[in-house]
Amino acid sequence: ESYYISKYKIKIDEISIKRLNLGLDDIKSRSRDLNQLAEMSLFYCSKFPLTISKKAQKYIKKVDKTIFKDLLLVLGNTENDFKKQKIEEIMSKFLIEKGLKLSDIIQYIRAMITGLDVSPRIYDIMEILGFKEIKKRIESFING
């Protein structure tokens, strides 16, 4: 555990372990090697501030704060039922109302939530992290 604290500035607690267990199968299927698996797992354990990859920083610099503030308001209505299927339904409706496609905003969401430009499926990540954590991570970029 001290290795992770010194190298990555994270402390693996029970919440981190729970999140890792829920997301590990998806991460394993997307990882080419053990190093990539470890890197793609860090966002489940990270506290603020998130470590942002150079590629993800490009997306974060271009974030349209208004869209993501509106998205958080809409997602907040599902806080007590923050499951993948419900998140997909809400996002789909939101995107239609805004005249957008998922591909228009997915990389921005991924960058703000994970600090990465590549990750497991975003709806799975959102469910595992939960609304409060998602809100904290997105707000740190749109307010900061």
Where are these regions (language model features)?
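Charged substrate- and nucleic-acid-binding regions of tRNA-handling and nucleotidyl-transfer enzymes
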Residues: 82-144
